C-alpha cells in the first residue's frame, strides 16, 4: 500500500532527553578532563548528530576551539588527541546517559498512535553501542521501546550523514520501499541521513539540539523567546533539507497524514 510504513527516530532530543543535554555536557567534561581545554555548551552542540569520535574531530576544527588548542599546544588537534578525548568521553557518557533516558512529553502517546496505524518504529543514534546498551533498557523502563535500533559504530560503512543506519532499519523492519519511510531528527546530520537514504525527513525545532533548552526552561520561557529560538532551529533544519519541521514528535502523526496524501498522488521524497 502506498503509505508510510515506518518511522526511523533519532534518540537524544527526539525521543528522550529534551534539549539533548546528555551528550553536550559530556563533551565539555571530556575536553576538560583529557586536556584541560574549555569548550562551551554552544560549541559542543554545533556538530550534533555525528558519531561521537567524528563529533570530537569536528569540534577541534571549529575556529574558536582550534585557536584555543593552538594557544595551549602550538598545533591543531591530532587523531591521537581525538582518541584521548573519546576515551574520556565514553565512561562519562555511559555513566550519565541513564539520567537522560526519560521520554520527551508526547512520545509514548505518539508511538502508540503510529503503531495503531500499522507503522513500525525504527531508531538510530550518534551514540556508540556501549552507550546505547545502557540507554535502550533505561528508556524501556520508562515505556519507550522501538522495534529496532542501530548505534553509530554498528556498521562498517559508518554513521551520519551517510544513509546506512537508516537503511539498516529498513532491512531489519522489512519495509518495502524507502519512500514509505520517514526519518525524524533534531539535528542536521540526521536530516542528511534521511535524505541520503531516499526518505521523507522531519526536523524537530523545539525538543532538541538546535533549540537547546531544558524542559523546565522551555516551560518558563516567554512566547517571544520561544518564537526566536524556534525560528533559528527551524531555519537550520530546513537548510539541511528537511521536508517538514515541527516542534516535537507529538506533531508527527499530522505530518504523516500529509505525507500519505502526497504518496497517494504519486509524489516521492
UniProtKB/Swiss-Prot annotation:
Enzyme class: hydrolase
GO molecular function terms noted in the UniProt entry: magnesium ion binding; phosphoglycolate phosphatase activity; phosphonoacetaldehyde hydrolase activity
Family the UniProt entry places it in: Belongs to the HAD-like hydrolase superfamily. PhnX family.
Record keywords: Hydrolase, Magnesium, Metal-binding, Schiff base
Active-site residues, as the UniProt record annotates them: 10 (nucleophile), 52 (schiff-base intermediate with substrate)
Cofactor: Mg(2+)
Cross-referenced Pfam families: Hydrolase
UniProt GO BP: DNA repair; organic phosphonate catabolic process
Binding sites annotated in the UniProt record for Mg(2+): 10, 12, 186
Quaternary state and interactors: Homodimer.
Catalytic activity: phosphonoacetaldehyde + H2O = acetaldehyde + phosphate + H(+)
GO cellular component: cytosol
Cited PANTHER family: PHOSPHOGLYCOLATE PHOSPHATASE (PTHR43434), PHOSPHONOACETALDEHYDE HYDROLASE (PTHR43434:SF19)
Free-text remark on how the cofactor is bound: Binds 1 Mg(2+) ion per subunit.
Magnesium is among the record's keywords: yes
Role summary: Involved in phosphonate degradation.
The name this protein goes by in its record: Phosphonoacetaldehyde hydrolase
Lineage of producing organism: Bacteria, Pseudomonadati, Pseudomonadota, Gammaproteobacteria, Enterobacterales
Entry EC no(s): 3.11.1.1
InterPro entries: HAD-like_hydrolase_sf, HAD-like_sf, HAD-SF_hydro_IA, HAD_sf, PGP-like_dom2, Phosphonoacetald_hydro
Amino acid at each position: 500500500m502506498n503509505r508510510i510504513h515506518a518511522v526511523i527516530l533519532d534518540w537524544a532530543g527526539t525521543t528522550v532527553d529534551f534539549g539533548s543535554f546528555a551528550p553536550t555536557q559530556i563533551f565539555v567534561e571530556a575536553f576538560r578532563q583529557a586536556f584541560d581545554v574549555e569548550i562551551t555548551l554552544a560549541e559542543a552542540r554545533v556538530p550534533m548528530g555525528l558519531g561521537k569520535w567524528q563529533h570530537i574531530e569536528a569540534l577541534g576544527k571549529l575556529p574558536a576551539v582550534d585557536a584555543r588548542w593552538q594557544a595551549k599546544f602550538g598545533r591543531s588537534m591530532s587523531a591521537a588527541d581525538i582518541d584521548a578525548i573519546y576515551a574520556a568521553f565514553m565512561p562519562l557518557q555511559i555513566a550519565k546517559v541513564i539520567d537522560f533516558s526519560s521520554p520527551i512529553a508526547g512520545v509514548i502517546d505518539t508511538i502508540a498512535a503510529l503503531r495503531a496505524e500499522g507503522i513500525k518504529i525504527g531508531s538510530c543514534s550518534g551514540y556508540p553501542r556501549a552507550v546505547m546498551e545502557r540507554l535502550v533498557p533505561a528508556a524501556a523502563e520508562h515505556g519507550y521501546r522501538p522495534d529496532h535500533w542501530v548505534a553509530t559504530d554498528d556498521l562498517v560503512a559508518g554513521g551520519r550523514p551517510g544513509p546506512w543506519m537508516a537503511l539498516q532499519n529498513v532491512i531489519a523492519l522489512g519495509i518495502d520501499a524507502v519512500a514509505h519511510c520517514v526519518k525524524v531528527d533534531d539535528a542536521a546530520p540526521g536530516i542528511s541521513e534521511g535524505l541520503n537514504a531516499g526518505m521523507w525527513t522531519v526536523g524537530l525545532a523545539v525538543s532538541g539540539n538546535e533549540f537547546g533548552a531544558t524542559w523546565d526552561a522551555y516551560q518558563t520561557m516567554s512566547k517571544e523567546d520561544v518564537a526566536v529560538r524556534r525560528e533559528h532551529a527551524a531555519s537550520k533544519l530546513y537548510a539541511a533539507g528537511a521536508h517538514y519541521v515541527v516542534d516535537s514528535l507529538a506533531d508527527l502523526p499530522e505530518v504523516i497524514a500529509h505525507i500519505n496524501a502526497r504518496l497517494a498522488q504519486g509524489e516521492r521524497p
